């Protein structure tokens, strides 16, 4: 699996190696083509440019991501470095491209899909789109750009619907919906964080865990038949720093995060009330 994206892609995939290992899956190779803050039009425009991406990798059976230097690869070289079964794209959640449809975004997604297909003309990979997430309820973008968090989530959903209707994206990974679901649960404490770091990125612990469970259910389960339910991977780091907030993943809260992911996969364009969890 190749994940093309930015820091939000790290949020969605950071806990995947541990989850795969816990599930007994030791034959999946994963790579992240990463550039912090990059938007899909920039990935498209600079596809063959040198020193654009950091190459993160997780070899089959490994339990963490590794990298071989910083911003020292072209996206083209990474796409052409292996034969991929799945490639995902992710827009920068901090950019209007994540929620406002225009020809630039449509052209970038379609163009990247073309490049991916050209690299594997006889064996086109499944191409997925990792959904953006709504900012924490206390973010300064409200009400500047959106009246509230629900309005932002609805704009993101509308954007994803247009992407699937007007580009060659095959599947959506609804990590943004899993976060919204989790926010309705008892895990969303009244601490001003709204399961985020600085109202922007995902909580290092439980929110990233729910996002990884969403990726697992959407991409890994159909290929392996292995369910994410009951996954034994845990994450013990705890922090109350605003920019590094981390809710540890425990035996008590992991099933709630996984439920948020499963419900997101079941109804990706609507929030599921999880107040009973």
Question: Model-predicted segments: where are they?
Answer:
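Short, surface-exposed connector motifs at secondary-structure boundaries
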Residues: 1-2, 124
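Short hydrophobic segments within beta-strands
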Residues: 2-4, 33, 130
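Catalytic nucleophile serine of serine hydrolases
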Residues: 7
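Conserved SGNH/GDSL esterase-like catalytic core that processes O-acyl groups on lipids
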Residues: 10-106
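Intrinsically disordered, low-complexity coil segments
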Residues: 49-68, 101-103, 118-124, 165-166, ...
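Alpha-helical cap/lid subdomain in secreted, periplasmic
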Residues: 72-205, 217
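Conserved catalytic region of serine esterases and O-acyltransferases that act on ester linkages
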Residues: 194-195, 199-277
